[in-house]
A protein has these predicted regions:
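Terminal, basic amphipathic appendages of nucleotide-handling enzymes
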Residues: 1-25, 39-49, 53-57, 61, ...
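Hydrophobic helix-and-loop "lid/oligomerization" segment in the mid-to-C-terminal part
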Residues: 2, 9-136, 157, 205-206, ...
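Structural signal for conserved beta-strand scaffold positions within catalytic alpha/beta enzyme cores
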Residues: 8, 163, 178-181, 217, ...
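Acidic, two-metal ion nucleic-acid-processing modules in DNA metabolism proteins
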Residues: 97, 232-275, 279-329, 342, ...
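Conserved beta-strand positions in the Rossmann-like core of class I SAM-dependent methyltransferases
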Residues: 109, 162, 522
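Short gly/ser/thr-rich secondary-structure transition/capping motifs
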Residues: 120-121, 143, 515
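Conserved phosphate-handling catalytic cores of large alpha/beta enzymes
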Residues: 130-133, 137-225, 231-234, 396
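Histidine-centered active-site/metal-ligand motif
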Residues: 166-167, 351, 409, 498
């Protein structure tokens, strides 16, 4: 297989048939639901309805006490200051908190930290300044749960504090009301920071709160929290609200990003809207993004959206430059260093605001954990991204003797380091990765939701699969696989970056686009068969709508595939008592009976895949 392989979880056919009958779905869609844990008809109906569960907001941490403090501050006419963060979730949480507090008649101010001057979280200097400026109550959003000492000092100076957050707490909580997903008896701990503020607004009884679901959806998708349970309902409802939003800032942002409000989805948020909001905090100060979300003036909204558009273009340019320089470094490494299973790449004057994005792109390129470090006169800071098999947080812990500060989680982390320790850290990190990662861990594996035939790829199937949206973490877009395809009508598009092609499977031909695979044009022109992994979508062109394959990966179909199909056909025709053990196992795994032969694909059998991929000898 080229570029890794694919994996297909097992799926009991009787459950698929039963669910398809109960819900009136194709077996393809029913199979996707069963593989994702929605095999029970009622559970599947609830999932497809994407309604927001009515979880009680007062189960969320110290909600009663928080509401009491906020209401008291409003009644006393005291100023409430909302302290947020510089990413999309922190900006949206600040905008939502400011808006709902104003709806309740509060005197509200806000503070967003600079990534470069204050860094993440709550600083003692900031809290002291806010107290001096007359802040009566500090409300943190998307931050604060680990700021134990800072909040203690603020309270000692007379500043009242309420913390709302969704990050993991330390061993000790701040000595104030804490509204957070952990620790809590709340039944769904995966809300983003803006989602927590939304629950606070519910508890406060803010009227007409649904009008702010557009901002909640924006933050929930951007913060890459699981789109299941309450998050799924919030995003589904929020996307409908976003399509008809009256907020001038969001309308201007969609216009600037060329997003049609009528068809806005989670993908548009993740890849078009969120990067523009993030650009403000990545390259400068997040104030412009917050102003955009809060403004009631369409002209100001247009000006601010244009400013974010310019910042996002600058971000893209800086990102591409750093990526090129990082790739050049790796290419110049000696062969032994390139074979390391974990990379550390460092550069002078790289922009700290984008190194996390570049680290993610390097992980995609090299399929191994990467730490990217930017240095300058004010020190060296790094951002790391990982692969599923590697615990990045654990790796930094193992190498912590070389670091000044570090933190994060399994998939992503940050650090600061002294320049003199760079080489030692790179060596220690690479050695740790070599010790815990196997060669197979570095091979990308594409998760398949269902195996299909060319005749299955219809607009009706597009509509069924779209009902599983919104897609994101915990509910990824559906990936289908067609095995043994022929590729034709190949041509490079988009300055040679992408491929347009036709995919034919068992005589049924479909149009396809393969983004970022323009360099593979000559390879795919070979007269071979391929296994194509793709997402199915409805494509509108010149007034017509047709199904289109958005290709994720194309794998060489193993040479033995045709031989194995013929062998199994012979085994099927043989008397059951004369079949080999391998053939009998394959037929059992496919749950085949005489009248249903051919209803399932051979690659749904683990035994068949083992024989196909490992070149086991075939018994006669």
């Amino acid at each position: 297989m080229h570029e890794g392989t694919w994996r297909l979880p097992p799926c009991p056919r009787p459950e698929v048939v039963s669910l398809a009958s109960a819900l009136g779905l194709s077996e393809t869609t029913a199979g996707v639901l069963v593989r994702r844990g929605y095999g029970d008809p009622e559970t599947a109906r609830t999932f497809l309805a994407a309604e927001t569960p009515a979880h009680d907001p007062f189960l969320l941490g110290d909600m009663d006490a928080a509401c009491e403090r906020i209401r008291a501050a409003i009644a006393a006419g005291g100023r409430i200051c909302v302290h947020g963060d510089y990413d999309v979730d922190g900006i949206c949480a600040t905008a939502l908190a400011v808006s709902v507090l104003q709806d309740l008649g509060a005197d509200v101010g806000w503070h967003l930290p600079s990534r470069f001057e204050e860094g993440y979280g709550v600083s003692a200097d900031t809290l002291a300044r806010l107290a001096e400026e007359g802040c009566h109550l500090l409300l943190t959003v998307d931050c604060g749960i680990t700021a134990v000492d800072e909040i203690a000092a603020a309270r000692a100076s007379g500043l009242d504090v309420v913390v709302t957050d969704h990050h993991r707490p330390g061993a000790t909580l701040p000595d104030c009301p804490v509204v957070a997903t952990r620790p809590s008896s709340y039944p769904f701990p995966e809300l983003c920071g803006t989602g927590v503020v939304f629950k606070l607004a519910q508890a406060l009884g803010v009227p007409n709160l649904e009008r702010h679901l557009d901002v909640v959806a924006l933050a929930t998708v951007a913060d890459v929290v699981p789109l299941v349970d309450e998050n799924r309902g919030l995003v589904a409802s929020g996307l409908k609200r976003l399509a008809r939003t009256t907020k001038p800032g969001l309308r201007a942002l969609m216009a600037s990003a060329r997003v049609d409000p009528a068809v806005v989805d989670a993908g548009a948020i993740a890849f078009r809207l969120a990067p523009r909001i993030n650009a403000a905090g990545r390259l400068g100060h997040p104030k412009a993004a917050l102003d955009l979300l809060l403004t009631e003036d369409p002209q100001e909204a247009g000006r601010l959206a244009a400013q974010l558009e310019s910042l996002n273009r600058d971000r893209q340019s800086v990102e591409e430059r750093i990526l090129r320089e990082a790739l050049d470094q790796v290419e110049q490494w000696p062969e032994a260093k390139r074979r390391r299973r974990g990379y550390v790449v460092a550069g002078e004057e790289w922009h700290r605001g984008v190194i996390g994005i570049v680290a993610s792109r390097l992980v995609e390129r090299f399929h191994r954990p990467v730490v990217l470090i930017a240095g300058g006169e004010d020190g060296w800071t790094g951002s790391g991204r990982s692969i599923p098999a590697f615990d990045l947080h654990g790796a930094l812990a193992a190498c912590s003797d070389h670091l000044e500060r570090w933190g994060g989680h399994r998939a992503a982390a940050g650090l600061s380091i002294d320049k003199e320790n760079l080489e030692a850290f790179a060596e220690a990190f690479g050695a740790h990765a070599d010790g815990v990662l196997a060669e197979d861990d570095l091979m990308p594996s594409t998760h398949i939701d269902a195996v299909v035939r060319g005749a299955d790829l219809t607009l009706s199937l597009c509509e069924e699969l779209e009902a599983l949206a919104p897609f994101g973490l915990g509910n990824p877009g559906v990936t289908l696989l067609a095995v043994g395809c022929e590729l034709s009508a190949l041509g490079a598009v988009g300055d040679g970056k992408h491929l347009k092609l036709a995919v034919t499977h068992e005589g049924a031909r479909s149009g396809a686009i393969a983004f970022g695979q323009g360099a593979q044009l000559d390879r795919y022109r070979r007269a071979l068969q391929y296994d194509v992994a793709f997402k199915l979508q409805a494509n509108q062109w010149n007034g017509t709508v047709s199904p289109q394959l958005v290709v994720k990966r194309i794998f060489d179909t193993p040479d033995r595939y045709a031989e194995l199909r013929k062998w199994l056909a012979d085994q099927w025709r043989a008397d059951p008592g004369e079949r080999t053990a391998e053939a009998a196992a394959i037929f059992a795994e496919l749950e085949l009976v005489e009248e249903e032969a051919g209803r399932r694909h051979l690659v749904e059998s683990p035994t068949f895949l083992d024989i196909l991929r490992e070149s086991f000898p075939l018994a006669a």
